[in-house]
């Protein structure tokens, strides 16, 4: 039996799981699911090669849930993921698949969460743990997590964990697991380091390779925008700049559908939310309004939008980036129908660049970046639309009835020129969307590769003084990874944001040098960051984060004695330890070397 005529019932899965799948809308297994489930349900090891978006989460979650012991309240299933976003996604999938199974508890463990909350959740006895290597290793060392009863281990996106430098931590964790467990390893590629792990820890694994069937959509113009500032403000700008018949905005959660819809309604857009909490009758009414033009914008989750087919949709906005490429293809496929052209826009946070690369790789395309629509352009657009509305009223038959009201609008019976009166009425009529759009107040800190400008002692080229005079709310830190280590800005931003629970929007300029890098972070973190990142590694190298200068420094950095120690490629940190400097009559003690007895990984 091929996967095209199989159902999930064909695998002999627990009836409660089948019921949950039916509720979600899962009918037919994907190729990776059809290939993996029969082996995993029998307790066999599986080595799977499949692209992100192939449905591999269900491929391992469903058979492992089938074999779980509901009456045993200890960790039985462990899933390792490279990022906290993926950990949350996988944990949610387990919860959705097991919602009809009484007594199943799922817990996601990742950096950035408070330990006390995680300990409280661990004491409740979750059977399924999903987490990132660094935080899981911390719990193992603290003896707050026991894997002695584990029977199933999953390494999800193993090649990504290798690229991010987590493989040593993964191997350490695997040595803590009983030999009798089964292992499922999934990876888009199969480098030698991953092969070595499979040979060392897996028992005669069944190797399964699934080719991606994701195709490009030449009829859809695709672009992405790197997020900075408030996403809702940016969303309004993109909607105003685009001529569309109907738009669908994809978000990740039910709450987000309501929040975004509320914002759009406030700005005068005819929009509605579509989520899993809606009953079938209300859902059908909403879709009917979208089809006949009574509704222009729909804010939906992936699950709620299943089966959505409306020819009017000409614009798709991925407000929250999907976690896999298949979901992205399904989303943008809502436009460009019936021979029409369509447009798709993707909002990408700095920490989500990896997901963008996965989408581009799976679709074999390069998605172009766009800028936020400019203020002058938006002002022009708003004025044009407002002028159209004014013209409609000028052509109305009852306009003469309102002419008689004009004299009554003049305050205190004073004479008022008609232009001032019209301007006042215009200001009142503009509503939430001002006809005069203010210039952008948020300047995007672009995370670009910057050449090592310290060569030939050209210190002034970095202009630290002007930078810090501009922004008093950031401190400058140094980390011990640079271009010679193969590091890129995305690696640094991802690690800092992921482990430090720092929004990527709050990360300032990142500068790459030969043997180290500098990064701007919000002011006031210098006492906590060394402990937070004590074991953090990027590309398998400890970052050893150190405070260089804080925003309270008043002097001219170019006047500091021996500043070449910072600026030359031959950084002599030993000489700089606890050294005192004098600048503008103010003595500053700058500690540049932080002793790290323990280390911590993302």
From Swiss-Prot:
A motif (Q motif) lies at residues 6-34. Gene3D superfamilies: 3.30.70.330, P-loop containing nucleotide triphosphate hydrolases. It is an enzyme of class 3 (hydrolase). It is found in: Cytoplasm. It catalyses: ATP + H2O = ADP + phosphate + H(+). InterPro entries: CsdA_RRM, DbpA/CsdA_RNA-bd_dom, DEAD/DEAH_box_helicase_dom, DEAD_box_RNA_helicases, DEAD_helicase_DeaD, Helicase_ATP-bd, Helicase_C-like, Nucleotide-bd_a/b_plait_sf. Belongs to the DEAD box helicase family. DeaD/CsdA subfamily. This is ATP-dependent RNA helicase DeaD. It comes from Buchnera aphidicola subsp. Baizongia pistaciae (strain Bp). The gene is deaD.
């Amino acid at each position: 039996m091929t996967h095209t005529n199989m159902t999930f019932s064909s695998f002999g899965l627990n009836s409660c799981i089948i019921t949950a799948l039916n509720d979600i809308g899962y009918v037919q297994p994907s190729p990776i699911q059809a290939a993996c489930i029969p082996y995993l349900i029998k307790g066999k090891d599986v080595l799977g090669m499949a692209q992100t978006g192939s449905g591999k989460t269900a491929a391992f979650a469903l058979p492992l849930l089938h074999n779980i012991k509901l009456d045993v309240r200890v960790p039985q299933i462990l899933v390792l993921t490279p990022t906290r976003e993926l950990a949350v996604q996988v944990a949610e999938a387990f919860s959705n698949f097991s919602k009809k199974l009484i007594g199943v508890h799922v817990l996601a463990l990742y950096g950035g969460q408070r330990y006390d909350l995680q300990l409280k959740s661990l004491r409740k006895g979750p059977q399924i743990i999903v987490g990132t290597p660094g935080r899981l290793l911390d719990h193992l060392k603290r003896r707050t997590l026991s894997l002695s009863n584990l029977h199933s281990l999953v390494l999800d996106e193993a090649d990504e964990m290798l690229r991010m430098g987590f493989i040593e931590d993964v191997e350490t964790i695997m040595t803590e697991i009983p030999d009798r467990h089964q292992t499922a390893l999934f990876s888009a590629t199969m480098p030698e380091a991953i092969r070595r792990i499979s040979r060392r820890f897996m028992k005669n694994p069944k190797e399964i390779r699934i080719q991606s069937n994701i195709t490009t959509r030449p009829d859809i113009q695709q672009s992405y925008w790197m997020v900075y500032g408030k996403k809702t403000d940016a969303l309004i700008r993109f909607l105003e700049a685009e001529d569309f018949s109907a738009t669908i905005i994809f978000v990740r959660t039910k709450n987000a559908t309501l929040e975004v819809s509320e914002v759009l309604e406030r700005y005068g857009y005819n929009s509605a939310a579509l989520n899993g909490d809606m009953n079938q009758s209300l859902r059908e009414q909403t879709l009917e309004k979208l089809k006949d033009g009574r509704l222009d914008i729909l804010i939906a989750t992936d699950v709620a939008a299943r089966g959505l087919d409306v020819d009017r949709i000409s614009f798709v906005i991925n407000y929250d980036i999907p976690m896999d490429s298949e979901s992205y293809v399904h989303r943008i496929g809502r436009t460009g129908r019936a021979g029409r052209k369509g447009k798709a826009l993707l909002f990408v946070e700095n920490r989500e660049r990896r997901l963008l690369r996965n989408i581009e790789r799976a679709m074999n395309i390069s998605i172009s970046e766009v800028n936020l629509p400019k203020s002058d352009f938006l002002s022009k657009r708003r004025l044009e639309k407002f002028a159209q509305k004014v013209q409609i009223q000028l052509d109305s038959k009852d306009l003469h009835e309102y002419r008689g009201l004009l004299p009554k609008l003049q305050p205190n019976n004073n004479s008022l020129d008609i232009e001032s009166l019209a301007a006042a009425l215009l200001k009142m009529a503009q509503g939430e969307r001002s006809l005069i759009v203010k210039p952008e107040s948020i300047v995007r800190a672009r995370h670009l590769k910057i050449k090592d400008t310290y060569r030939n002692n050209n210190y002034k080229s970095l202009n630290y003084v002007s930078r810090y005079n501009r922004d008093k709310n950031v401190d400058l830190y140094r980390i011990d990874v640079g271009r010679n280590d193969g590091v890129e800005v995305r690696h640094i931003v991802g690690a800092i944001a992921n482990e430090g629970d720092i929004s990527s929007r709050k990360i300032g300029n990142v500068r790459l040098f030969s043997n180290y890098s500098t990064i701007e972070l919000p002011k006031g973190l210098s006492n906590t960051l060394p402990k937070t990142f004590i074991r953090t590694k990027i590309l398998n190298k400890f970052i050893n984060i150190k405070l260089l200068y804080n925003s309270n420094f008043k002097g001219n950095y170019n006047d500091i004695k021996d500043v070449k120690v910072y600026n030359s490629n031959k950084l002599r940190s030993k000489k700089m330890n606890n050294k005192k400097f004098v600048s503008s009559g103010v003595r500053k003690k700058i500690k540049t070397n932080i002793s790290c007895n323990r280390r911590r990984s993302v």
